[in-house]
Amino acid sequence: QLVELVVCQWKDQFVAYEENGVHYRMYEPECMGKRPLVLFLHGGGECGEDNELQLTGTLGALRLAERWSDMYIMAPQAPSGNLGMQEMFEVMKKRGNPFSADMGITPFSLKGERGWNRDYVAKVTDIIRKMISDGKVDENRVYLIGMSMGGGGVLQTISVAPDLFAAAVPICPSMNGESYANLLHLPKVPVWITSAYMDHQHSRHAFILNACNKLWQEGRTDVKFTLYTQEELAKYGIGTTEGLTSQELDAENHNSWILALHNENGILDWMISHQKNKEKC
């Protein structure tokens, strides 16, 4: 009932747009003047062209609008490449284990087949830049958050437009040859990466930690990495189902974005406390 209430209350407040091949929904605050903007990137299950699933698939964008009704919340939908979720996994299985963080596997986004490819996210950022030039958005307060494939999309988008964002939160970001390289060479944008202590993409944590260690050794104090514990996940009913196999537990733990969207450890407060060209609030 709570989920239905959130959908009914906020979904219709997201206006549908299609611009330069980008399908997106925008929550527009009633406040006058320049407002902050939060860009939300969905996961792999919400790709498509219906311009709706990115809102209803995980409710992430709706939760953000509920929390920050005085900000713009932008929720683009990544292209499907004419592949459904199961079809995508079948293609990935032919390349290797779809749940491994294999740096040798060419990700879909490199080939432009599906997801947050560089050309598409560049078009998304162009829309935001136009909103800034039109005086709608505060150029010093543009934020970025995404989950799973969208977490990898956060790293992709930062690499495409490093000057645009004040801070970002990649949640359980997919790790492949592209997203790992983007994290290794992360531009100077504050990021707080989160994931569950166990996740369905095995070795995800090892690659994230390896990249973070490199950044920390370079003096990047603006990079944070948190693994949610079993106890923290259980507070939100994640991983508590009786009789789960290890594979099923991994899959359930992948819902760790629920914690971030509930501001666990103050992660959302941390994100919006940043402003470009200013010290952290």
Segments from the language model and where they lie:
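Alpha/beta-hydrolase-fold catalytic nucleophile elbow
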Residues: P76-Q77, I145, I171-C172, T194, ...
